[in-house]
């Protein structure tokens, strides 16, 4: 194919990267709205005004022009008029307030069957660029496959668009465009999306869910006219920074840094960190286009050096539990040029900023790459560094940028009392000592073959009851907590309050919120996310004397693909201790509302329809003291779960926790076990956790883990690859290797003995090890103005 140039394709291999966000899984195929988009743009404007972060492109994904399987027109479509009653202009204007341009997802055809229809589609695309300054089109096979006879029509339209927006970026997602391909800027690498634990997941054990990006293959030849789908910030957001460092500085494609999803779900303190990555990339964007792969034998897997003859930014990765030592040769080996007699500053930019060394050409500088992390190292000629940059000595820190991307303050995470500075900035400080950096994992030991314990059911149920099967976005919100930033809150609210999210019934709290129209579990049946039929498990928070439990759910009049025939399991069970279970038989099913219309999200297109049916309440007789309730093959679309005391009064549950997708105990079979009894360290920090990781092929859902401490069974609150979940966009990825279970540690467990268990469903050659890991949520010991 003809070599792509700026004239033919909007960019070439030496075009500096364009920083971008795109809206996939902020909405799905139904598309966004003006209100939701404005809320998101206000968030990015806040990042711009507060931290100087520059976003060049905000790209709508599916459903905002074309949809899944159809083409559309914002001036004719009732759907789009409802979404954007004032056309796209209010969103265009809001983006322009902080120097941003819009882009949109669509199909590469839509040119109709007549010359008039072809011209109409042509004119629409040109209009978006000429009148609204659209800077990106993403053309995706999900919309439809372009007809061969329309390839030239596609090319003519894009060529005309570039008369008004010469640097228009056109993404080709999985399409054959023939003669029109030259008009496209990029292709999607391996067709891979990067929604963590939905489309990609860990294949090895690790302390977090983002091990895959640390070992993702490089693009052959370091081709930059490609698209890697960016970094998804929506699920399991811990360590998004490492993922983004690799995307922006290692691959450094034409779109970088590139994120998508829901970045407002990270913590408030992490927002400055996100902006910093964008700001550092912008500072060096002109020279980052020049990259080279370093020797794997010397520098490790996927080490990349980018820059010019005086300045190199080197990205390292470490996809292991142990620190990795790397020795950097200051000279031509990392692509420095004309370096004889020169001195260089070596500075860590990520995961912490830190002065490493002042070195001469020919020197070797040794650094350590933290376990399960990425690292970004700057090597720059000394006089240039002192003019353009700064580094603090005697500490590990991170820079917080202010308006205009100017360094404003530093957060100190570790200091030895001798903080100094090199370069064009200094700090006002008192003597500071302390360390709040993320501690390295502490090895506990290898789990070894042991008899299957007599209380296997109790141990299995402990982890099943601890599991979170809510949407991954709901889990991210719980992880990050409340925000004090109005723009962040508005973007979060816009996401969680959209109908397409609510109608999927992804959060178990709907059963307890007192709202008669919210429900839990709308898609587990037709999405086939239930394991062996699933099991509704409810931890009531504490033990109660219970007479009966009532569960209200929806019963459809005529089953559809999305709403299956209702089923009421005849026998539930309750327990006070997960070991001893008593039966709670179904007493009866009563119609509580004989006519009810429920909204339903249609599969694939994600548009809203409605189905007729009724509300029914199933009553289970308990007459026991219990904390735990389990019901195999449960009903779906559950409006409420209510327990009653022995006097028939409704119990106000203090802290219920529920899930619905893991297999009933009588449907699973474990054939072997391993265990480890170990004394925990005395000095772990608040928020620390135990990780039990299995490396090797264990089979789908092939290993489960639990711990015992002080006579109690403690289940894993999280797992990588994740537990099955009530999905937002798509169901959790299945994985047959690399499971890691995570268990919360409490202060009373310090220095105490615990027993770690692993149970296996298959004969497998695996290694299962345990570690104590530090929390990602570490706060600085000081904050200094610069």
Task: Give each language-model segment a name.
Residues 290-311, 383-418, 662-679:
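Surface beta-strand/loop "capping" patches
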Residues 2-41, 51-57, 61:
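An acidic-aromatic substrate-binding cleft motif
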Residues 1, 158-159, 164-354, 362-376:
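Active-site-proximal substrate-binding groove within the catalytic cores of carbohydrate-active enzymes
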Residues 57-241:
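Aromatic- and carboxylate-enriched substrate-binding clefts and catalytic-loop regions
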Residues 333-355, 434, 698-704, 713-718:
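Short aromatic-acidic-glycine turn motif
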Residues 357-410, 430-471:
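C-terminal beta-strand-rich structural cap/linker in extracellular carbohydrate-active enzymes
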Residues 319-338, 408-428:
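Surface-exposed beta-strand/loop patches in extracellular or lumenal glycoproteins
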Residues 273-280, 286-291, 298, 429, ...:
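Disordered, acidic Ser/Thr/Pro-rich linker "stalks" and the adjacent N-terminal cap
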